[in-house]
């Protein structure tokens, strides 16, 4: 079973940044240190990141991109339709992963339970290092004037220092901003 990762998305207004570490672990062994778990979709208008089984994540990325195309890039509609399929489809139901998605207007967490959640304070964190990254990001968002990219970088570094399934080989993508 592949496990462990940290994906973090931080938003200030229309500036949204999503980052993830590069570690893929099989059991207690690092199988890969430079995986890309965050990517741009929908002609560079949507950010997406995954936590969970690598094979499952690629299936979900492909399905979600199809939903975005079908619904004209409407993130919320695509996310709701994806969650419906994920929950009801016999094959998809077995996939073990979570998706964080965002465009310039909205950030959402999509789970296999059919959940589509808009985060509090514009921060989404998933994966084994998620709680550490979430704590750091919320503190930096509340008490500093750092931009979302700086917050994502700093928070993922904190998660990598604490979570053994998270490394500091980061992939960071952003939309909007200066």
Curated annotation (Swiss-Prot):
Gene Ontology MF term list: metal ion binding; threonine-type endopeptidase activity
**Purpose of the protein:** Protease subunit of a proteasome-like degradation complex believed to be a general protein degrading machinery.
> Quick one: a GO biological-process term for this protein?
proteolysis involved in protein catabolic process
Its catalytic activity?
A: ATP-dependent cleavage of peptide bonds with broad specificity
Q: Which InterPro entries match?
A: ATP-dep_Prtase_HsIV_su, Ntn_hydrolases_N, Proteasome_sua/b, Proteasome_suB-type
Give its E.C. classification number: 3.4.25.2
Subunit structure, briefly?
A: A double ring-shaped homohexamer of HslV is capped on each side by a ring-shaped HslU homohexamer. The assembly of the HslU/HslV complex is dependent on binding of ATP.
UniProtKB keywords: Allosteric enzyme, Cytoplasm, Hydrolase, Metal-binding, Protease, Sodium, Threonine protease
Q: Quick one: which gene encodes this?
A: hslV
User: What's a Pfam family in this record?
Assistant: Proteasome
What regulates the activity here?
A: Allosterically activated by HslU binding.
Extract one GO cellular component term from the record: HslUV protease complex
Cellular compartment(s): Cytoplasm
The entry's protein name is: ATP-dependent protease subunit HslV
Which family is it part of? Belongs to the peptidase T1B family. HslV subfamily.
């Amino acid at each position: 079973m592949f496990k462990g990762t940290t994906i973090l998305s931080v938003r200030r207004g229309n500036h949204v940044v999503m980052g993830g570490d590069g570690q893929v672990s099989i059991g207690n062994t690092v199988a890969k240190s430079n995986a890309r778990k965050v990517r741009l979709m929908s002609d560079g208008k949507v950010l997406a990141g995954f936590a969970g089984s690598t094979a499952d994540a690629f299936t979900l990325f492909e399905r979600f991109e199809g939903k975005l195309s079908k619904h004209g890039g409407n993130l919320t509609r695509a996310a709701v339709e994806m969650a419906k399929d994920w929950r009801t489809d016999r094959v998809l139901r077995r996939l073990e992963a979570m998706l964080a998605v965002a465009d310039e207007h909205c950030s959402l967490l999509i789970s296999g339970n059919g959940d589509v959640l808009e985060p509090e304070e514009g921060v989404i964190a998933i994966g084994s290092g998620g709680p550490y990254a979430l704590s750091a990001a919320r503190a930096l968002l509340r008490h500093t004037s750092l931009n979302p990219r700086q917050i994502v970088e700093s928070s993922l570094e904190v998660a990598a220092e604490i979570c053994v399934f998270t490394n500091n080989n980061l992939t960071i993508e952003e939309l909007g901003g200066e």
